[in-house]
Every structure is written in C-alpha cells, then in structure tokens.
C-alpha cells in the first residue's frame, strides 16, 4: 500500500470525484479530503507511480492540484525497556527474540540494557508477558514499558529527535542542554577558539568610597557577623575589668600588718633573697653547726654494723626477763623504722638458726 498526498484541492472537489480520478491507474483502498488537501491509498506501488506521473499539476475545476508520495512521520511505536542484558548479546539476537511477538522497528543496546521499538502496542504487551523475568543468554532480563519521554520515535541516523531536549536539527552530543536539563556553558569551547574571556574587574571588599561613610546605609546584620579573635579577647578583658571595678569599688583597701612592708610594693622581686637575722654570736652559730653535722654525718649509717651490735652472739641464745626486754626496747628506739624491719627479719632468721639448741 502506498499513501499519496493531494494538495491545492478546490472547494468543489469531492471524495467520489477524487477516487474515480485515481482509480484509472490502480485500486484505491481509501480516500480522504481534509479542507484543501487529501490522502489517497493505492494498493500497488506501480499504480501509485503512474498516478503521480499523470495527475501531478492536473487541472481540476480550474485549479492545478499537486500529487506526490506522502512524507508522513514514522508510525508511532511502543518503546520497551529491556534490562539486565548479557554483555555478549548483539542487536540482531535481541531483535530476533522480540520479533517472535511482532514486527520490530528498531533495537538499540546501551551497555547492559536496551530499547526495543515495536510496531504495534498489542505485540509489545505480549512481549512483556512472554519475556519479562525470563532467561536469555544466561541472564534473567526484565522487560517493561519505557518511561522515557524523549526519543519515543525510532530513527537514530539523522539529526532528528534529540535525546536531551527533544528538538530536531542536532544530535544529542551537540545539544546545548546538559544531562541535568540546564543550558550548557560554552565558555571553555569559546576560550579554545578565541582565547580566554576576560572577566570584568570588580572592586574588593571595602574599596568603595562610601564604605567608611559614617552616614551610609545601616548594617542590620552587624550583630550576627563573626568578630576576630583579637577583638573578642579585648572585649572579654574589658568586661572582666569593669566587673571587678563595679563589684569591689565599695570595699575599703585594708593592708594587713602581717605582710611585710617590702612585699606590699608593686616592684617585688620574686627571686630576691634576704639573710636571716643574727640572733647570737659567731661561737653559738658554730656550735649549732657542729652539733648538726655530728648528729647527721657522725652517726654510723650502716645497718649491718648497727644490727651486729644489737643481735646476741652465737651460742648465747635469747634471754628472758625484764633486763632483756629493756635492752630490746632501747635498741628499737635507737633504730629507725627501716632498721626495725631489718632487725625483726634478722631476728627471725637467727631464731630459726638457734631453734635446735
């Protein structure tokens, strides 16, 4: 079947008149007139070519009509989305799989999914029922109606039906709209061809002549702006000083008599040392120093020699009675706590040693 377009029809023309005119060259299946143009469907292609050759610019009711093959757009198809496709699958294999349910207009594989355009909607529904969640080349594929609004019509060889914006006249790689739906920025492409684009000079912060104007516009957000560390520290120190002045201003300034007069001055040297007052003569000081040195350095510091004097000799044993207790008590007072521990431990050792006698 071939569809012919008839243009520039006169108002007096009727469908019966147009049908009888084209039946001279072949069988007419359908004839429709829409205002000043119409369509005629001829069964044979050769008959359609003869009708075009003989009836183009044919004068009908004083008007030359135009007869040519119809250049209508592609038939509306049903677009299917096929997911989870094997990486080894080809377009021919996938097309053959879907042609089992009806004519396939186009089949395109994109990575692990594909789009299949079927000519009839009822065939697409049958393909979904028969192929969804089925094994194909070792993987379970998912078939469903495509929800993409762009590129619903088949045809990828010409500059028609851009994937991104849906307009005609360019491919998707040349589309000014990016993948997010915004107009793309061609600054980089322009810079490569014509050099870098100079941006206008903008004045820096505070360079305006009216910036420091005391009677300028009010800054309503000044209280919310972040201040520098130095300003915050200075404000904190000032507030602390003012608080001390307000709270302690009514208290009298009392100077304690116990504090020496040389410590009340503000110029006190913490490293200044003062000699103790001389309470006696030089002879007294020398005697005190000699006593201190004799009591500390003159004493025998060896615990072994001190314990040897206190412990009883071998074979004498331990005595009992008040005299022995007093001697042990006097020895304990002469020794330190460390010496007492050593003495008791050595006494226990000696006791075990002389227990057989």
UniProtKB/Swiss-Prot annotation:
**For the region Interaction with TNPO3, what residue ranges are annotated?**
196-357
Zinc finger motifs (CCHC-type), residue ranges = 160-177
Q: In which tissues is it expressed?
A: Expressed in the suprachiasmatic nucleus (SCN) (at protein level). Expressed in the suprachiasmatic nucleus (SCN).
| CDD domains (alphabetical) | RRM1_RBM4, RRM2_RBM4
Q: Report keywords, A-Z.
A: Activator, Metal-binding, mRNA processing, mRNA splicing, Nucleus, Repeat, RNA-binding, Zinc, Zinc-finger
User: According to the record, what induces this protein's expression?
Assistant: Accumulates according to a circadian rhythm in the SCN.
User: What Gene Ontology biological process does one annotation of this record name?
Assistant: mRNA processing
Q: Where is the RRM domain?
A: 2-72, 78-148
Query: How does the record describe its quaternary structure?
Result: Interacts with TNPO3, which may mediate nuclear import of the protein.
Biological role: Required for the translational activation of PER1 mRNA in response to circadian clock. Binds directly to the 3'-UTR of the PER1 mRNA.
Q: What is this protein called?
A: RNA-binding protein 4B
